[in-house]
Amino acid sequence: AKNLQNDSLFWGTWINNMFDYGSVRRPYGVNGAGLVTIDRRERKDAFYLYKALWNKEEPTLHITDKRRTLRDGERQAFHIYSSAGAPTLLAGADTLAVTEYATCQYRTDSVSLRGTVEIKAIAGPLRDSVTLRVGNVLKPKRLQGPRRTVNPQPTN
């Protein structure tokens, strides 16, 4: 968005679809290019980016990638969309440094997190939060030993 706003040859923006919709030609039968999910329950990150950039009447604050609450690996970085000024980002009780990299777009460097962590963004009166499980949450559990049948049947 930063490069597009400064380009004198760029003169318009179009949104292809407001909502995801069913499509026979697409994998899983869904065209996922919309700003809102097919069940209309969740707004995608692009929705909040456009809202932060274009809606000057209602301030916006949004932590991106909130739908992915299970995260593998301890190093995590966060992106925030805010039209209410520079946000303060808290990971548990720690404050994370936030830098603006484009209009209404902020990010943090990677930080080391572990376990269940609540991430909170604060910008003026606005609040947004997400609870993440970070670490080796995606690895399958190991079995204690080989499985044995209680009464094995003899085979021929």
How would you describe each model-predicted region?
Residues P125-K139, Q144-P146:
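Edge beta-strands of extracellular beta-sandwich domains
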Residues A1-L96, R107-S112, T116-L126, V150-P152:
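Extended substrate-binding grooves/exosites of carbohydrate-active enzymes
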